Amino acid sequence: EDRMKSLEILKTFAASYKKPLFLAGDMNAEPESDFIKELQKEFRILSNPKQHTFPAPAPKETIDYVAAFKQNDKGFAVVSSEVVNEPVASDHRPIVVELRTAEKADKIFRTKPYLQNPVGNGMTVMWETTVPAYCWVEYGTDTTQLKRARTIVDGQVVCNNKLHKIRLDDLQPGQKYYYRVCSQEMLLYQAYKKVFGNTARSAFSEFTLPVTGTDSFTAVVFNDLHQHTHTFRALCRQIQDIDYDFVVFNGDCVDDPASHDQATAFISELTEGVHGDCIPTFFMRGNHEIRNAYSIGLRDHFDYVGDKTYGSFNWGDTRIVMLDCGEDKTDDHWVYYDLNDFTQLRNEQVGFLKKELAVKEFKKAKKRILLHHIPLYGNDGKNLCAELWTKLLEKAPFDICLNAHTHKYAYHPKGELGNHYPVIIGGGYKVEGATVMILEKKKEELRVRVLNAKGETLLRSE
């Protein structure tokens, strides 16, 4: 009788709380007792009553429990519950219930969304969350009538992860689209039970795919930032008044990635710095993206054109070809420990180039731009791609080639070094030698401006 009265006091006390409230301890009552049945009207038992807790040496009864007040039990999930095999520490065996509490909605996003792979009448939206989540993108030509896109692989929605990649397909070139990313925390993902937490929705961002056959665009190219935030921000100040359509990071920007956290931090720095939620970015590999423990995982943060680290695409009537030079030393160099085979990658791109130079998209393009990190011309060291690629490229009618790697700005007009097209090499990560390239296509003209971190013009090609 006294126990039942104490239960009423407990219920009254619990009702005054607005947050999850837990009750744990020796109830001195078995699961079938009137007391436990009455308790369960207001409390949800989280421990497993089928696992006995008393007496500790050889348990035969369940009289210890962990329970949650039902009125406020929505902000968590039970991950596991067990009675610990500890027969001597007490006359009761300990109970352990592992809970996962819900994150606040305003803490769910780790990064802002950033746009990738704006080809084939589509756009990829990527972002990260602080917790495993079920995610989707809401998008449309206005913010009142929205479609929903998710990533579905082999019939299953990709979820319960933190790095998110969702493709928006069948978009209209030249049409402005609005979108926002949505992430609902997944507290529990089991075979027959899912528990969801709060939902976060980003602010609306917008983007526009290029009009098919457009003859004008502006692009910005960075290189060799080597995770130097100060240098990057100084260069961004020089382009803040430029209305650019896409951005290329031409290698050694997210260098030597040691961990997911390190990569995420600087990728966010880069994408936010160039308004990557509205402007698509292309991340190309330099030799330093290939190094360190997280180098293989780095590709998960991007959506490469054709799912390769090299490729080609059209921006209007201009063809852009991107190559991956791999490392700057031979595969048998001791520092690689026989874990590299860039010879295969370079040979693979020979086949790619032969096909690329023969397709109508390349042949009929009004202008053709080549990008790769390590220069074939003007490089202090040996370019391991030269023997494979030079003869193919010297026959191709490229209008400009943009390179990096040497950490020293240089411009080599056509023919100066035996090059069959003009070559521009970007500067390095030190503020005094850093550069940013502005690529401008207007009707029949293709121009490149190179600025330093002070805003001084180093080159204005015609």
Question: Which residues does each PLM region occupy?
Answer:
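Acidic, histidine-bearing metal-coordination/catalytic regions of metal-dependent phosphoesterases
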Residues: 72, 90-93, 98-221, 240-242, ...
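Extended active-site neighborhood of metal-dependent phosphoesterases/phosphodiesterases
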Residues: 182-206, 261-358, 388-397, 410-429, ...
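Active-site regions of metal-assisted phosphoester/phosphodiester hydrolases
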Residues: 1-106, 187-190, 212, 353
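Conserved, compact domain cores that house catalytic/ligand-binding motifs in diverse enzymes
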Residues: 215-293
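Conserved beta-sheet core of the metallophosphoesterase superfamily
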Residues: 36-68, 164, 380-444
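Active-site-proximal beta-strand elements of phosphoester/diester hydrolases
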Residues: 1, 216-226, 317-327, 369-373, ...
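Active-site environment of divalent metal-dependent phosphoester hydrolases
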Residues: 27-34, 53-61, 227-233, 255-259, ...
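His/acidic metal-ligating clusters that form di-metal
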Residues: 2-40, 133-135, 242-246, 273-280, ...
